[in-house]
Amino acid sequence: MIKPIKIGIGGPVGAGKTMLVEKLTKHLNTDYEIAAITNDIYTKEDAKILLKTGVLPEDRIIGVETGGCPHTAIREDASMNFEAIEELMIRHNNLDIIFIESGGDNLAATFSPELVDFSIYIIDVAQGEKIPRKGGQGMIKSDVFVINKTDLAPYVGADLGVMEQDTKHYRHNKPYFFTNLKDEEGLQELINWMRQNIMLEGLKK
């Protein structure tokens, strides 16, 4: 049985986590076998949304209801997510990638290193240009940081240059990307990075 690469996607409510899973799957599933796990507090709404996009069939999506503390389900007690991973691997023994989307949470939420191999943390511009300056652990410790909805910057008075400067201050040389996922702006750069650094395509012969 192939051991899939597990990629965690975290971020606040409304930042674009589910859309990021959708877009990444859409562009990667021609080359890789993919499944997804979504975490919601009391519903399986994100799993339903992902299913409606058509990028994955129903048997490749599992919705996890985490209860009151979504960060606990991806870090302190990730048992429900481990069970979902096991179930997906039983259903499909050839998976290359499993995306694990966290429930919407605060800037301090991080994934257990036992649960995921890589993590992506996403915020959106509409939350304010000061968000990177707050230096939450999700932003600092994630392997990749995504600032989404750049198209909204003029409408909310956010300076992307300031956001980039603050991001560099906290992340140093760790990668970050500006995106407008709705129109797929900046998406290809993120995918290229993932192909090279997560899927190690450049090392494959």
Curated annotation (Swiss-Prot):
Keywords: Chaperone, Cytoplasm, GTP-binding, Nickel insertion, Nucleotide-binding
UniProt GO MF annotations: GTP binding; GTPase activity; nickel cation binding
Compartments reported by the entry: Cytoplasm
Residue positions binding GTP: 11-18
Keyword Cell inner membrane: no
GO process annotations (BP): urea catabolic process
Highest taxon of source: Bacteria
GO cellular component, one term: cytoplasm
UniProt cross-references to InterPro entries, sorted A to Z: CobW/HypB/UreG_nucleotide-bd (IPR003495), P-loop_NTPase (IPR027417), UreG (IPR004400)
UniProt family annotation: Belongs to the SIMIBI class G3E GTPase family. UreG subfamily.
HAMAP family linked: UreG
Quaternary context: Homodimer. UreD, UreF and UreG form a complex that acts as a GTP-hydrolysis-dependent molecular chaperone, activating the urease apoprotein by helping to assemble the nickel containing metallocenter of UreC. The UreE protein probably delivers the nickel.
Free-text function comment from the UniProt entry: Facilitates the functional incorporation of the urease nickel metallocenter. This process requires GTP hydrolysis, probably effectuated by UreG.
Protein name, as recorded: Urease accessory protein UreG
Organism: Bacillus cereus (strain ATCC 10987 / NRS 248)
Lineage, top ranks: Bacteria, Bacillati, Bacillota, Bacilli, Bacillales
